[in-house]
Amino acid sequence: MKFSQWYTLTAPLLISSLYTVNAANDLRGVASDKSDLYKPDAKGNWKCLGSDKLISFNQVNDDYCDCPDGSDEPGTSACHNGKFFCKNTGYISSYIPSNRVDDTVCDCCDGSDESLIKCPNTCAQKAREYLATLEEHNRLVKNGLKIREQWALESAKKTDEVKARYKEISDSLVAVSAEKTQLSEKVEKMKRSTDLGAEAVLPLDFQDLRVALLSLVDERNEMQERLDILTNLLDELTLLYETDKFDETMKEAILSFEDLKEQEIRRKVSSDDVHNYLESCNNHLSMLTGPSEDITFSSLIKDIKKILNSLVWNIKLSLINFGILSPSASSTPLTDSESYRRFEAAQRDLDAAEENEKSLEKEHTKLMHELEYHHGWDLYRAIKGMETKREIGGYTYKVVFYENVFQDSILLGNFASQEGNVLKYENGQSCWNGPHRSAIVTVECGVENEIVSVLEAQKCEYLIKMKSPAACSPDQLKQSLLNTQNSANENAVNGMEDKESSVDEL
């Protein structure tokens, strides 16, 4: 008789006799801490675990599914939704689907799922492999944590330096603002001084006005140049549309546009500055032309002469600035007086104080934003700017923490936000007939910065996996789940699915 024929005839009898023996002791397929759930009542009946259905206790493990939840057949394959408990002494207790019970395939390492064939006990071997994998995993996490701790210390030190610099700038800003106020009052007082005279400061008023107007003209000319460049780029793209060179030209045009955007714009002068200079000129002209009891024809001629001398001095100064005259040609009688020299020195001090204040305000604002921004990692300042490169699929990918991501020379995105160990980079270069490129970088614990994989999940949207000590956490250290006692402990697992995934993750 063939084995298959013998198995078909004898299996029901053997299984039935086995289940009868187990009925008197622990039920097959039931964890020891669940055995109390499988006790008959005084009448020999038993209630299904997942419903109110009452059956005879003799129907438990009789190879026929009576309960809707399959709880009456923990040790057979009768119920499609049942589950069998593998004790796996020396390894990790687990559950398997009950349709794998007595299918002549050994699923439990202790072989308890197969009653008709002899399964080798592989629990000890699996335990050794598991412990080796667990030890290696924890070693990597610990090494990554050591590096991360160093980065965190560096970041904390840099944060303290930023805070100290912020306080220093704040104190300096207060002092410079007070100094500027004093100098401004001093200069205004000197302008109104009879020793200096309005005719002496009027050229300075005109000089300020001239500089402001020239700055506005320069700004207008620069903007016109930028407009002309952009217009030419668009004209070239229009002419090359639907040609073989369009993609290449498009790339060059975009790079040119990026370079153009990065060029520094000259200092802007607002219309308020021009208005203030005009008002100052008007005030000092009023001082010259206002009614006076002492005005005579002779004094009027002298005043006109002084004004003309001032205008000539202003013109000479302009010619010197343009490199037409030498500085020696700028001397005029107005600069000979001690009062004027003191005024000129005070004006220089005021200009220097104003420039210093603007510089301090700019740095103060930058530091304030830096301190107010909350980053996802406490080691932000230590790793900002760190580059990680790898060639994948013929492209060189570069990830710069908290800055940008590149595919060769193509910008995939600038850093936008962080959620946990996921960094988002957005507003990269535009795809042809598509959106702006973007990248999501998911970082896992590792002993060094490494790009693991790159996937273009959707058009121009890239998913990048990395390893880095930055993503290591003490929570990632795993404890052994081995069942070291000779008793099934279901508390060692949180269900069949959780257990299998926990082991696989190692």
Curated annotation (Swiss-Prot):
**Disulfide topology:** C86-C108, C431-C460, C445-C472
Motif ER retrieval sequence: list the residue ranges: 503-506
Q: How does it assemble?
A: Heterodimer of a catalytic subunit alpha (gls2) and a subunit beta (gtb1).
Protein's UniProt name: Glucosidase 2 subunit beta
The cellular component terms of Gene Ontology attached to this UniProt record, alphabetical and capped at eight, are: endoplasmic reticulum; endoplasmic reticulum lumen; glucosidase II complex
**Subcellular compartments:** Endoplasmic reticulum
Q: Which residues form a coiled coil?
A: 172-243, 338-374
State the organism's lineage.
Eukaryota, Fungi, Dikarya, Ascomycota, Taphrinomycotina
Q: Which GO terms describe its biological process?
A: N-glycan processing
Source organism of this protein record: Schizosaccharomyces pombe (strain 972 / ATCC 24843)
Key words, A-Z:
Coiled coil, Disulfide bond, Endoplasmic reticulum, Signal
